[in-house]
């Protein structure tokens, strides 16, 4: 039975035994030292939500996301999406609005404090709500350019009316 992305993440949280949690979509490839870079960032910035640099799998020179932001209308978006990767976002670890659910690293104690993912969202934008709750509880989110993944994107859904519905419904 497909219980949706947030509930699947919550099941993983319930079974996780470690001090840290990493959420990974099933349609990506992690690159060398991706996890080490998260621990380096955590040591420097402390308890927070962290996301890597994400390049498209089909075009390794195209950005999939380099930090998720919230625009003036309150909608979340992936900064840099579709831009050529020319190193513009490679210089520093930067504070962002919220970490992408494609790949997110965080201490489990944050989840214990802010709660699990909202399963009513089913798919898409669940990390916006999660990141917002983290921020309201004093936790920041950071983009870590030294941590790199290649993301296929839409491996399970492609484009469909249901995907469009979920994307639009969950934006509000």
Regions found by a protein language model. Give the residues of each.
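Conserved donor NDP-sugar-binding/catalytic core segment of glycosyltransferases
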Residues: 28-75
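Active-site-adjacent helix/loop segment of glycosyltransferases
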Residues: 136-172
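Hydrophobic/aromatic residue at the end of a short beta strand that borders the catalytic acidic motif
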Residues: 5, 24, 28-34, 56, ...
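Glycine-rich, basic loop-to-helix element that forms the pyrophosphate-binding segment
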Residues: 1-16, 26
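Short aromatic/hydrophobic "clamp" motif used to bind/position activated sugar donors
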Residues: 21
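Conserved donor sugar-nucleotide recognition element shared by glycan-biosynthetic enzymes
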Residues: 5, 9, 34, 102, ...
